[in-house]
Amino acid sequence: MFTLTEYFIAACVWLVLYKVGNLLWNRHHYFKQQKARGCGEIKHYRHRDPILGLDFVYTLSKAFKEHRWLPWQQELFAAQGVKTFQANFLGSRAIYTSESENMKAMSTTYWREFGLEPLRRGSGAADPVAGPGVSTVDGPMWDFSRNIIKPYFTRDGYSNLARLEVFVNRLLDLVPTDGSTFDMQPLLQRWFLDTSSEFLFGKTVDSLTHPENVKVAKAMVDTMRGIRVRLTMSKLMFLHRDPVWMENVKIVRDFVDERIDASLTQLQDVKSGKGTSCTENQPDGRTDLLWDMVQQLQDKEALRGQIMAVFIPSNDTTSILISNAIYALARHPHVYQTLREEVLALGDQEITFEKLRGLRYLRYVINETHRLYPNGIQMVRIALEDTTLPVGGGPDQSQPIFIQKGDIVHANRYLMHRDPDNWGPDAEVFRPERWGDVRPLWKFVPFGGGPRICPAHVLVDTEASYVLLRFVQRFRTLEPRDERPYKAIMRIGPSNLHGVNVAVKTA
């Protein structure tokens, strides 16, 4: 008879042998496939802990906690001296690259071979906020989710500037015009919550006119911050125990559930003949995304997952883009004046979508803001099968690299957008004029590319452009009132830790 201690020792020995055998098999498979596919070796990060890579995890976590995640990435790549390298992240192989060719391959040629569901749904990082939806799933479920939302990001949706006018006026009416300092960032968060809630749910939150509703906007900010922390923690996510975060998640879920319940009830009333309708499927003229969804899905959990997968990531994108543009414009008064001259040249003309798109310098400002302050810092995907990427291997980094099933690839937009090889020696400088003679193609991908490009990319740029147009029309000058440099605090995307403290004078 074996004792309990002997059973325990035997189990430990078996586990070690299994792990070693699995490691040896993976290495054999890796080198065999690497050779067969004509791939070169990738540079290795020099670890102090080669087994789990805890040294790498520690430096990453420290940078994240100190709000140095963006400069840390620049320092990390500079220390490697290459644009593609691999590191050990808690025992898993992680590939880090800032090569545009690799970004292109992951987004187009091999896009089905790279997924995100195991990272967002499988890991539980997005739970309990977002269920299955367009930004959390792969395969047939992604096809279904994409088809549900696609009609709402067509020209009819993003070219309707009239729906923005009332919200933009409310926003700008809250801006002090006596030259006093104010923070534009929280105002824009409230503005976007109001516009997006009407677009997605058919009813605005009205946080700009009813300050008591601001708690939803604040809860959204904290919810997105928590999701980013959980995604970054990866396998250590089980250590994330934040009761305040859960309270904010509940506020957001309750907000969404209330609108789902009301829409499901309204649908039943229409079907039973109790509800009034302007058209067969649009009671009271509803044309919002949720109303279309409830006609295809009546399961509350499924509806919440689908709408949350749009509501959560979109809540950061537009407001932060405008915030960053105003931050940059305040520090470059000549750019602000050039932009204002272009806008004022329109005179009293009606601002249509076509006229908005025709404002060249405004487009340059939007692009330059995307370039220096991309909302999506990196595109992270997990290999769903063995595959390759076109560059990063061999002594000169020009050979393809082998990506093994389960490898996690971090394609870094932030570094790509600030690379002097792509943008010249002034790559770190805010200079909208550069867009008059550059055609960056895959070196500039603020919304990604290929089939999984952000479906709202035209809508985001249109809304941001319209707000900036109205802003420069109304305010003659824009001054910075905070000399501290930009310091990113990470949510889904980065926002300025110090806010956007400025002052304006009216025209």
Curated annotation (Swiss-Prot):
Span of the signal peptide: 1-23
Ranges in a coiled coil: none
SUPFAM superfamilies xrefs: Cytochrome P450
Disruption phenotype annotation: Leads to the accumulation of pre-leporin C at the expense of leporins B and C.
Cofactor(s) needed: heme
Sorted UniProt keywords: Glycoprotein, Heme, Iron, Metal-binding, Monooxygenase, Oxidoreductase, Signal
Residues the entry annotates as binding heme: 454
CDD domains xrefs: CYP52
Class of this enzyme: oxidoreductase
Glycan-carrying positions: 315, 367
Molecular function (Gene Ontology), one example: iron ion binding
E.C. number(s) listed in UniProt: 1.-.-.-
PROSITE patterns assigned: CYTOCHROME_P450 (PS00086)
Entries under PANTHER family matching the protein: CYTOCHROME P450 MONOOXYGENASE APDE-RELATED, P450, PUTATIVE (EUROFUNG)-RELATED
Family, similarity comment: Belongs to the cytochrome P450 family.
Biological role stated in the UniProt entry: Cytochrome P450 monooxygenase; part of the gene cluster 23 that mediates the biosynthesis of a family of 2-pyridones known as leporins. The hybrid PKS-NRPS synthetase lepA and the enoyl reductase lepG are responsible for fusion of phenylalanine with a hexaketide and subsequent release of the stable tetramic acid precursor, pre-leporin C. Because lepA lacks a designated enoylreductase (ER) domain, the required activity is provided the enoyl reductase lepG. It is possible that the dehydrogenase lepF also participates in production of pre-leporin C.
Protein name: Cytochrome P450 monooxygenase lepH
Organism: Aspergillus flavus (strain ATCC 200026 / FGSC A1120 / IAM 13836 / NRRL 3357 / JCM 12722 / SRRC 167)
Gene that specifies this protein: lepH
